[in-house]
Curated annotation (Swiss-Prot):
The lineage of its organism: Bacteria, Pseudomonadati, Pseudomonadota, Gammaproteobacteria, Legionellales. HAMAP family: YciB. The keyword Metal-binding does not apply. Belongs to the YciB family. It comes from the Bacteria. Its main location: membrane. It is found in: Cell inner membrane. The chain crosses the membrane at residues 3-23, 54-74, 81-101, 119-139, 149-169. PANTHER family: INNER MEMBRANE-SPANNING PROTEIN YCIB, INTRACELLULAR SEPTATION PROTEIN A-RELATED. One of its GO terms (cellular component) is plasma membrane. The gene is yciB. Plays a role in cell envelope biogenesis, maintenance of cell envelope integrity and membrane homeostasis. This is Inner membrane-spanning protein YciB.
Length: 181
């Protein structure tokens, strides 16, 4: 259910774009992101950092898209999120006691420090590649293709990456890791 909630703004953007175009879809995504953050706050009594991060980017780039009537600003949004995520993941390898991926997953899986750092680097590289891929599609194809890529390509590549990561992790975990759950 949380995954669906997390994808709520992008799914709404996709549907509205198909019927009303990029500017209406951008406005709806901005409102959906704001609603998502408010609802999460009311329900759980705190904010989720990723929702706030995404909200800030969509308000700035979505606002610029609407103000200047230029879709290129919103097309940069996924790249901004991917590349800032890459920076945060990479930085966490040098700032703090543990890489970010370890902080996120260590309650569910037991890995060596070396593997946590490799996994963190893999996510960093994944985010860099996805940001570059978004720009490639945005600049080499029309907006219809970019919108489809944004939803289906972004989600598809992420799921594929997680699946590959799961296979990699099975070689580096022991049975006790899975007994925790």
């Amino acid at each position: 259910m949380k995954l669906l909630f997390d994808f709520f703004p992008i799914v709404l953007f996709f549907i509205v774009y198909k019927f009303f175009g990029i500017y209406t879809a951008t406005a709806v995504a901005m409102v959906a992101s704001l609603t998502q953050v408010a609802f999460y706050r009311l329900k759980f009594q705190h904010y989720e950092k990723m929702h706030l991060f995404s909200l800030a980017i969509i308000m700035v780039l979505g606002g610029a898209t609407l103000f200047f009537q230029n879709p290129w600003f919103i097309k940069w949004k996924p790249t901004g999120i991917y590349w800032l995520s890459a920076l945060v993941f990479y930085g966490s390898s040098y700032i703090g006691s543990k890489p970010l991926i370890q902080k996120m997953m260590e309650a569910n899986i037991n890995l060596t420090t070396k593997i946590w750092y490799r996994l963190n680097l893999a996510w960093t590289l994944f985010f860099i590649v996805m940001g570059a891929l978004n720009l490639y599609v945005a600049y080499h194809y029309d907006t219809d293709v970019w919108v489809n890529f944004k939803l289906f390509g972004g989600v598809g590549f992420t799921l594929l990456f997680v699946l590959i990561q799961a296979f990699y992790l099975t070689k580096h975990t022991d049975e006790k890791s899975f007994e925790k759950q």
